[in-house]
Amino acid sequence: MLHDLRIRIRFTLTVSAIFLSSLSAVAQTVEKGPVRTVLALGRVSSVVDTPMSLKLSRVSIPGGTSAVYRGAHSLVYVVSGAVTITVANDLRSVGPKQGAYLPTATDVTIHASEGAAAELLQYQLLRSADASKPAMNPPASVTELHQMKIPADSLKPGPHEFSMTTVMIPAGASRPRPHTRSGAALYYVLADGTITIWPSANIDTLSGESRSESRRIGDIQEEPYGFIHSWSPKADVPLVLLQANISQEGVPEIIFVK
């Protein structure tokens, strides 16, 4: 009887070890895939009435001061410092590596915390005719980084989602499947990596030669509909991207090549 009990215990321990090993393998597999974190999301009722652009700017607000924004749909990402964003009666604190959506045609007050300037990245979705207008009023100082004219075939009739997301691909992870956007996106590189591009491919066929190019911190990448590509990290550090995306409401942001 004691012998049988020992066999059962040994069997139970073996099965448990196999089960835990399987869970570990699954966890490692999951960890190797891209990790997407949505930081901010807004809704745009129409984007086909006039040519549209995505504009990216770096904004600095001195500590203890406030800037008022009233303009196009906007997304802000806090690089350093901290801010308090007030829209009507809604007040929200936003710290480093966090983001917020700023609605259009509304006074938005952005107050930088005492002691240090707040450094922001600001995406604006605006009419191309308004792209030269300043991103934010004094005392904020603004440096325009990039303007992307959104191709007409990237936008459809009806409401669209305007979102900001960080994408992290773990160090040494394999390259995700080639894909394109269903709308358009503008990326800012937060940690180095590589992009592979298929210039001759389309959403039905991965054809033609590919080329790989390094992207460093601060680099900017346009991703319109039909741009077939994939990102990959370095072997020893993760790839981190900040993405502003515009896509039709109810439609997946990403289209994988068949």
Predicted regions and their residues:
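Glycine- and acidic-residue-biased ligand/ion/polar-headgroup-sensing regions
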Residues: G71-N89, S182-T205
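N-terminal, post-signal-peptide region of Sec/Tat-exported proteins
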Residues: V48-R92
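Bacterial N-terminal signal peptides that target proteins for export
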Residues: L2-L13
